[in-house]
Regions:
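Class I Rossmann-like S-adenosyl-L-methionine
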Residues: 1-173
């Protein structure tokens, strides 16, 4: 269970970094006044909730419930209503938010406008797919210690564990 929690935490952290501009834009639409500096943890909690609502395959009610419960753990009970209201609003407005993001590529793809301009100029047909791919989780890479294993045998053991693999093309390890 610890390794599952660690993997989930890692996925959330990387996802927040990848999609920060988008998540921040969405969260600020539903927060009427800026949070105090000492309440950055609540802002982060909201960002995590928004990320999970948009990008993770978890039930919405569980995301919202856990986010609200975390306010108590942070000893900020006052924030429960805020976190609940923001995340429920995001949940309700998901379709309109997605449509709005489609008109704001620098926010949708979390890329600066200058980079989008360069990509658009150099790859007019492919710039959107390039930005989408920039935001994808990187593939896992394994290096086989050839002193202990043969590459083909290791791939075979991965396949037996129902893990798809392919040999790299840059090195033979």
């Amino acid at each position: 269970e610890d390794s599952e929690n660690k993997a989930l935490l890692q996925a959330i952290c990387y996802g927040l970094c990848r999609h920060y501009e988008q998540l921040d834009f969405i969260s600020k639409k539903f927060i009427n006044k800026p949070l105090r500096k000492k309440d950055k943890d609540i802002h982060c909690l909201i960002l995590i909730g928004v990320y999970q609502l948009f990008f993770m395959r978890m039930p919405d009610y569980a995301i919202i419930n856990e986010s609200v419960a975390t306010c108590s753990q942070l000893k900020k009970v006052w924030a429960k209503k805020l976190v609940n209201a923001v995340l429920r609003s995001v949940q309700r407005e998901m379709d309109s938010l997605t449509a709005e993001l489609d008109t704001r590529p620098e926010i949708k793809y979390s890329h600066p406008a200058w980079l989008i301009s360069l990509l658009k100029k150099d790859w007019p047909e492919d710039y959107q797919s390039i930005m989408q791919n920039n935001n994808q989780q990187a593939p896992m890479t394994l290096r086989v210690n050839k002193a202990n294993n043969n590459i083909k045998q290791y791939q075979s053991s991965l396949e037996q564990a129902q893990i798809h693999s392919s040999a790299g093309h840059l090195t033979d390890t």
